[in-house]
A protein has these predicted regions:
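Conserved mixed alpha/beta catalytic, RNA-binding, or beta-rich assembly cores of soluble enzyme
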Residues: 83-147
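Active-site helix-to-loop segments that bind/position phosphate- or nucleotide-bearing substrates
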Residues: 1-112
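Short terminal or interdomain "cap/linker" segment that borders an active site or interface and mediates
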Residues: 142-217
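Short N-terminal helix-initiation segments at or just after the protein's N-terminus
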Residues: 26-30, 138, 157
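Conserved active-site and cofactor/substrate-binding residues in soluble primary-metabolism enzymes
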Residues: 29-32, 36, 122, 126, ...
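Short cysteine/histidine-rich zinc-coordinating motifs and their immediately flanking basic loops
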Residues: 220-221
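Structural signal for hydrophobic packing residues in well-ordered secondary-structure cores
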Residues: 38-45, 135, 139, 212
């Protein structure tokens, strides 16, 4: 169960602005506020990750390992239909960023709170990309290919499977817990699964294009 102590040297400003619900075309937005939020996020982030490769039975949709899990939802089963093993991962940037963001809002510093929250989201997605790349490299060493990562709540994969999925990953090892409402805590955390097979790798679609939540304010097509 490899641990990943990632590093964050930068945060994608374009992604950060998207998560903040701000168009990159808005030229008059104060750059110093953006830069300040990025600096604060980088200073407060506590990047941690965990991942492992587990056997997978595509006929039954079951992940093997110490805590076997049978997946439900047509979209995830279809996504993994050619996989005989899967990479599972969980990452977090810790809770200090969300505490700081909450403090900004509490003090009436709404812009700072919004931008810091968005920077944290961009940061944890970047961390997930790093672990995703590790799994891709591990699969390639045995001549296998991966498909893009998929998280509980995508498509019709019910988020209610989050507790069992995180147990299969071992997410508690890096301080990630699941709330009674199946949300991850710390809030700026990600869990995901990546199919591994002999099939040629498929290009990853735009993240939003793969999601059916048409009303999402972060949607970017």
């Amino acid at each position: 169960m490899p641990l990943f102590n990632g590093t964050l040297f930068q945060i994608d400003q374009k992604e950060m602005m998207r998560y903040a619900g701000l168009s990159p075309k808005v030229k008059e937005f104060p750059q110093d506020a953006i830069d300040s939020a990025i600096r604060e996020a980088l200073a407060l982030a506590e990047p941690r990750g965990i991942w492992q490769i587990l056997p997978y039975d595509p006929e039954n949709g079951t992940i093997g390992g110490a805590h076997p899990l049978t997946l439900t939802g047509r979209s995830i089963l279809r996504h993994l239909s050619h996989a005989w093993s899967v990479g599972v991962l969980a990452v977090t940037v810790g809770e200090e960023i969300e505490k700081a963001s909450g403090a900004h809002f509490k003090n009436g510093e709404y812009l700072q709170g919004l931008l810091l929250d968005a920077a944290a989201t961009a940061a944890v997605e970047h961390l997930a990309d790093q672990v995703d790349a590790l799994i891709q490299r591990e699969a390639a060493r045995s001549g296998q290919h991966t498909v893009w990562r998929f998280s509980p709540g995508y498509g019709d994969w019910p988020v209610t499977q989050q507790p069992d999925f995180c147990r299969a990953i071992g997410a508690e090892t890096i301080g990630i817990h699941v709330t009674d409402h199946a949300m991850l805590s710390p809030r700026k955390s990600v869990s995901a699964i990546i199919g591994i097979s002999q099939c040629s790798a498929r290009p990853a679609p735009a993240k939003c294009r793969a999601c059916g939540l048409m009303s999402c304010p972060f949607r970017n097509l």
